[in-house]
Amino acid sequence: MSDNSQKKVIVGMSGGVDSSVSAYLLQQQGYQVEGLFMKNWEEDDNEEYCTAAEDLADAQAVCDKLGIHLHTINFAAEYWDNVFEYFLEEYKAGRTPNPDILCNKEIKFKAFLEFADEVLDADFIAMGHYVRRTFPTAEEIANGVKPQMLRGLDSNKDQSYFLYTLSSEQVARSLFPVGELEKPEVRRIAEEQGLITAKKKDSTGICFIGERKFTEFLGKYLPAQPGNIETPEGKVIGQHQGLMYHTLGQRKGLHIGGTKGGGGNEDPWFVGEKDLKRNVLIAVQGKDHPLLKSQGLLASQLHWVDRTPIKAPLSCTVKTRYRQTDIPCTIIPVDDENIKVIFDEPQIAVTPGQSAVFYLDEVCLGGGIIEERI
């Protein structure tokens, strides 16, 4: 029996393949494993796109197969108060938030961890995220070395962008078994072990709200205000159904395809700016249009994994959206709550409300919310 046999791990079981294989791997490593299924959204409709019941059934089937106990918990009130209301406020303000990041911060690694601690007496929690972490020795910890969060081994699936708000204390209490694997290997293990989730497709859409039609869903909570789509010169070229449905750099869904610009320009149209005061969407032609480009950004609501604010200019890389290639940049601290970031090369579609996440090689340093582009 390994040294882990006295350690209890509570695995966040989502009903997906990643958490299923995480539970199996931890069992193989000798841990006492139990599952916890979170319900974080109360359906107020009978639409076909909510899969909570199916996900719970799949999670239960996997736990039965592995011979582990599955607990359930309802965090719907916490999700509404700490994630969804912020999400709506940001959309009202014309920004584009990332609720998955806030969900990880407030629900999966806060409410979940507290419940696992206080009710289930956990030593660790585990999630099916594609990230890795370091394990400092007792001597290193005594000398102040903190665990670091690293990118997942599978660069195509790396989810460190969504977890930058974790502190080193939370990282220390968390295990990420599939972060050491590539996705095809995870599916192969699930298949070999006869887990019902082996071929289940990956979930997309807003964290816990599922793959429902986004505009329809958002329209239930925020009244849409249609307005004009204009060129930077002020020519009206179409109508939008609400600024909240559009994000900077967006090409699809403008319904102005075929509209020619000045001089017969037939380049595709992109969202270049949102004029909140006039409720006007500014559309520009060509992805190299100056309105789409930024030299850098200002960010606030900073979170550093080691909880140490950056005090001097730092050369590193940044992602301003998920799955983006790393952008070389320099962080210039303004104060403990704000930073200025200058890109080595101009970037397109830097979007206020989204997160800027910083890296030194494999290490995720942390990040912040983009306030404005510069």
From Swiss-Prot:
Residues 157-159, 321-322 are annotated as: Interaction with tRNA. Its main location: cytoplasm. Pfam families: tRNA_Me_trans (PF03054), tRNA_Me_trans_C (PF20258), tRNA_Me_trans_M (PF20259). InterPro entries: MnmA-like, MnmA-like_C, MnmA-like_central, MnmA-like_central_sf, Rossmann-like_a/b/a_fold. One of its GO terms (cellular component) is cytoplasm. ATP binds at G12, M13, S14, G15, G16, V17, D18, S19, M38, G128. It is found in: Cytoplasm. The record marks H129, Q354 as: Interaction with tRNA. It catalyses: S-sulfanyl-L-cysteinyl-[protein] + uridine(34) in tRNA + AH2 + ATP = 2-thiouridine(34) in tRNA + L-cysteinyl-[protein] + A + AMP + diphosphate + H(+). GO terms for biological process: tRNA wobble position uridine thiolation. Its EC number is 2.8.1.13. Residues 98-100 are annotated as: Interaction with target base in tRNA. GO terms for molecular function: ATP binding; tRNA binding; tRNA-uridine 2-sulfurtransferase activity. It comes from the Bacteria. The active site is at C103, C207. It is an enzyme of class 2 (transferase). Keywords: ATP-binding, Cytoplasm, Disulfide bond, Nucleotide-binding, RNA-binding, Transferase, tRNA processing, tRNA-binding. Disulfide bonds join C103-C207. NCBIfam families: PRK00143.1, trmU. Belongs to the MnmA/TRMU family. Catalyzes the 2-thiolation of uridine at the wobble position (U34) of tRNA, leading to the formation of s(2)U34. This is tRNA-specific 2-thiouridylase MnmA. It comes from Aliivibrio fischeri (strain MJ11) (Vibrio fischeri). The lineage of its organism: Bacteria, Pseudomonadati, Pseudomonadota, Gammaproteobacteria, Vibrionales.
